Amino acid sequence: MSRIAKYPVELPKGVEANIQQDQITVKGPLGTLSQALTGDVTVALDNGKLTFVAANESRHAGAMSGTVRALVANMVTGVSKGFERKLTLVGVGYRAQVQGDAVKLQLGFSHDIVHKLPAGVKAECPTQTEIVIKGSNKQVVGQVAAELRAYREPEPYKGKGVRYADERVVIKETKKK
């Protein structure tokens, strides 16, 4: 059995979980999220706690019980507190601004990049060189941040590009003659 699945997931105040045959739905103040369940994992709700047990003794069932527990724990956190990812733009003339449900980036190309945000994800720009992506689904928030970073990844000689706020870019030394 997975060591992660041993610990139950507690539902905070204002969060409800609904378990069907092959799906779990978590509803909270920041929205509703659903996750498909495999037949290898049995989920039970009692006294505001979700418990996860492998349905059989196979190695795959034990691994999946930990995976499902981690995904559901992220869902509970997402609908109660939410997730955010911060990006920083480093470079001369690099700017970002939010236009409705899209982020407009100026990253040194001959054209501006307009990245449309998926449903359930919001972005804000506290300054011209910072982007904060917020949402209830951790996977979607991380995916949007990765897509924005992919437009201009930090280059290793000057460090210019779009980077995560907590990312450290190792600067290489240039060639000497």
Swiss-Prot record:
Protein name in the entry: Large ribosomal subunit protein uL6
CC terms in the record's Gene Ontology section: cytosolic large ribosomal subunit
Q: Which organism is it from?
A: Bordetella petrii (strain ATCC BAA-461 / DSM 12804 / CCUG 43448)
Which UniProt keyword terms apply here? Ribonucleoprotein, Ribosomal protein, RNA-binding, rRNA-binding
Q: Name one Pfam family in it.
A: Ribosomal_L6
Classification via HAMAP family: Ribosomal_uL6_B
SUPFAM superfamilies, alphabetized? Ribosomal protein L6
Matching InterPro entries, A to Z?
Ribosomal_uL6-like (IPR000702), Ribosomal_uL6-like_a/b-dom_sf (IPR036789), Ribosomal_uL6_a/b-dom (IPR020040), Ribosomal_uL6_bac-type (IPR019906), Ribosomal_uL6_CS (IPR002358)
Q: Which NCBIfam families match?
A: L6_bact
Q: Which family does it belong to?
A: Belongs to the universal ribosomal protein uL6 family.
Q: List the PROSITE patterns hit by this protein, alphabetically.
A: RIBOSOMAL_L6_1
Single Gene Ontology BP annotation: cytoplasmic translation
Q: Which PANTHER family match?
A: 60S/50S RIBOSOMAL PROTEIN L6/L9 (PTHR11655), LARGE RIBOSOMAL SUBUNIT PROTEIN UL6M (PTHR11655:SF14)
So which domain of life are we looking at?
Bacteria
**Gene Ontology MF, one:** structural constituent of ribosome
The entry's function note states:
This protein binds to the 23S rRNA, and is important in its secondary structure. It is located near the subunit interface in the base of the L7/L12 stalk, and near the tRNA binding site of the peptidyltransferase center.
